[in-house]
Amino acid sequence: MPPVLLQAEIIRAGPNIDEGQLVIGVAIPWFEIIREIAKDPKCRFQIPWRKLEELIAGAYEREGWERVILTPRSGDRGRDIIVEKHGIGSIRIVDQVKAYRPDRRVKADDVRALLGVLTADPNISKGIITTTAEFAPGIIEDSQLRAFMPYRLELKSGSELVKWIVNIYNMEFRGHC
């Protein structure tokens, strides 16, 4: 991946609010980074953690969520991105993003920590952990964690992340060019 893409602004930031900064759009480098990932999914491991959070926040914005919030770099209380849809059946999701190397796994304790965030805040509908890597063996089968999946808890592995963002990219350009 060309380093210049990782130095560029990839989201259009709106005003700061109590929980962080609103994301109101994506910039051209966002599309270019997704295109690079589509060509070589392993390049996702080159993305610094904050840029990965921005990339994922941009994906939620492009997916049509009404409100996308990128939380501060520190003091986010286990919430990297907050997305909301309002109206009948309002939804509020927190996404905890893990920019891990290919050999590092998200552990069960990380997943349990997110469940703690869910139970402490009654306004959260669902928690997602999105990682560039994979989850430790046994997490998906863990009966205590499984009870929350898929309606309250979602675990998005690196391969699922790639599929998700490339699909959003392809939806943007279907029928163009």
For every predicted segment, state its role.
Residues 1-177:
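Mixed-charge (Asp/Glu-Lys/Arg
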